[in-house]
């Protein structure tokens, strides 16, 4: 591993992201994301993942911690998925929150012999932005190792998103919580073995399924079993709100708050299944699905 400053300078990169299928040239976005993410946001997300790995190491060393730390880990990973949060200021606040949480645990438990990700601390924005450039994807030089680490990381991001949605509905799987933290720490190892990373990828898939099962249980027990449903794809004349994503808890709150207001609710993309849940059908305000709006908006 080495810092990315020289790599960026030599290759004329100001960022590097290749986590989605739309990435530039099917290789990676190096100046601005195809999604619209700029280099400051991309680098801040890299730093958030880095300090979250550090927090994970600390949590693992302690063994038993308050569930709020696992929630913070999952939420941080969720923040970095494509189109979830492009607010650099908000991401840097989460970096600072994570550093404070990590430092508090280290001090209270007198932890030693930690990695740089666990020890790293700063409340200076300029220093945080400098560090962000050092800890990105390309910091792993070996391409096979890098690819497997990132494959695992992206699996953890999806797992964390489903885990977060289940958590807000009051459902939790401690094995999933601990797997996310333990696996994030494993990606920090300098002496990574390719076969171990392949096995870790398979374990990530297994636990990803567990997270999906947890979210399915949460959604069906709270909103009912999905039913075959005819969905309207037309648009009306009323003011409207467009909602995407997977958070049915947000959908319920939105439907309740907009009830009898004359405001229509349009689902988009991943939120299409909201139309199938029995509990949402009690609202007079019908859900309408928009297949391809010009932009994604998430509540």
Regions found by a protein language model. Name each.
Residues 1-8, 288-299:
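Single conserved hydrophobic/aromatic residue that forms the stacking wall/gate
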Residues 21:
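Cys/His-coordinated zinc-binding microdomains
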Residues 7, 36-212, 216-223:
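Active-site loops and adjacent core secondary-structure elements that bind or stabilize anionic groups
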Residues 202-224, 228-232, 238, 245-249, ...:
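Gly/Pro-rich turn-and-neighbor structural signature
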């Amino acid at each position: 591993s080495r810092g990315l400053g020289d790599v960026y300078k030599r290759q004329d990169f100001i960022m590097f992201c290749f986590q989605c299928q739309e990435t530039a040239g099917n290789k990676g976005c190096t100046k601005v994301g195809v999604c619209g993410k700029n280099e400051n946001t991309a680098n801040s997300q890299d730093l958030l993942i880095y300090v979250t790995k550090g927090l994970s190491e600390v949590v693992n060393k302690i063994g038993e911690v308050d569930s709020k730390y696992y929630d913070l880990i999952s939420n941080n990973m969720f923040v970095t998925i494509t189109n979830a949060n492009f607010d650099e200021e908000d991401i840097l606040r989460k970096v600072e929150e994570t550093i404070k949480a990590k430092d508090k645990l280290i001090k209270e438990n007198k932890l030693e012999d930690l990695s740089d990700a666990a020890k790293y601390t700063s409340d200076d924005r300029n220093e945080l932005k400098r560090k962000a450039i050092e800890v990105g994807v390309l910091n792993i030089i070996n391409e096979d190792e890098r690819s497997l680490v990132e494959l695992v990381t992206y699996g953890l991001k999806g797992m964390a998103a489903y885990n977060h949605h289940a958590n807000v509905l009051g459902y939790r799987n401690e094995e999933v919580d601990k797997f996310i933290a333990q696996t994030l720490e494993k990606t920090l190892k300098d002496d990574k073995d390719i076969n171990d990373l392949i096995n870790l990828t398979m374990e990530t898939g297994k636990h990803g399924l567990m997270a999906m099962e947890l979210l399915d249980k949460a959604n069906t027990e709270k909103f009912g079993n999905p039913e075959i449903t005819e969905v309207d794809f037309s648009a009306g004349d009323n003011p409207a709100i467009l909602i995407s994503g997977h958070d049915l808890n947000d959908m319920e709150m939105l439907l309740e708050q907009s009830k009898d207001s004359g405001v229509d609710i349009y689902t988009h993309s991943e939120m299409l299944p909201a139309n199938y849940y029995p509990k949402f059908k009690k609202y007079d305000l019908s859900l309408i699905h928009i297949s391809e709006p010009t932009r994604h908006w998430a509540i």
